[in-house]
């Protein structure tokens, strides 16, 4: 369970953020592919996202130190470095994501801004509408022994959710 930035009684009504860790054995090796699914805090003042990101990075580094391959992915509720170039945050936006910080040496972010990964739910979806805010806040963190082959946002035009799926193809390297 990730740190909760809200005090009682507000924390009762807020989502409890957590990580889902999946371990996949690597044939002929003691190493594992460790996949971490995440959904970090959205509606805090920024402290919660920072604390949750710090805890996430600590867990990822511990797994990498064991010799594992590590991929974390999901809704960071934070923009990737240079991730607002294609979808800039409008002045006075109803919601503004934080910005992810630098990673330890060798680690990398993987994201795709060809289509937005998220949208504000202030109005019904209309492709190309200037009346809503689009974001790129979903993606991945890769350990130094994982190379991205491709990252692709599937533009589902927000048919069933306020997010579009993001697909990563990666290669494990020694």
Question: What is the predicted role of each segment?
Answer:
Residues 1-32, 40:
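Structured beta-strand-rich core segments of catalytic domains in phosphoester-bond hydrolases
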Residues 10-11, 125-131, 155-159:
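Short proline/glycine-enriched turn/loop segments at secondary-structure junctions
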Residues 15-20, 31, 36, 133-137, ...:
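Residues that flank catalytic or metal-binding motifs in active/ligand-binding sites
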Residues 21-28, 142-144, 161, 168-173:
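Active-site beta-strand termini and strand-to-loop segments that position acidic
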Residues 45-48, 158-164:
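Solvent-exposed loop/turn segments connecting transmembrane beta-strands
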Residues 145-156:
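Low-complexity, intrinsically disordered Gly/Pro/Thr-rich segments
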């Amino acid at each position: 369970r990730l740190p909760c930035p809200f005090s009682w009684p507000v924390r009762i009504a807020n989502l409890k953020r957590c990580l889902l860790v999946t371990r996949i054995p690597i044939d002929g090796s003691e190493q594992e592919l460790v996949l971490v699914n995440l959904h970090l805090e959205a509606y805090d003042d920024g402290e919660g996202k920072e604390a949750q990101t710090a805890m996430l990075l600590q867990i990822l580094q511990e797994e990498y130190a064991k010799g594992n391959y590590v991929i974390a992915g999901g809704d960071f509720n934070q923009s990737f470095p240079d991730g607002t170039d294609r979808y800039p945050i409008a002045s006075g936006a109803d919601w503004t994501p934080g910005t992810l910080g630098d990673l330890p040496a060798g680690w990398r972010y993987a994201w795709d801004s060809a289509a937005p990964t998220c949208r504000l739910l202030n109005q019904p979806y209309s492709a190309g509408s200037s009346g809503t805010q689009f974001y790129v806040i979903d993606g991945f963190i890769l350990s130094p022994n994982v190379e991205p082959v491709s990252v692709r946002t599937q533009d589902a035009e927000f048919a069933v959710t306020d997010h579009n799926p993001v697909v990563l193809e990666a290669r494990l390297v020694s």
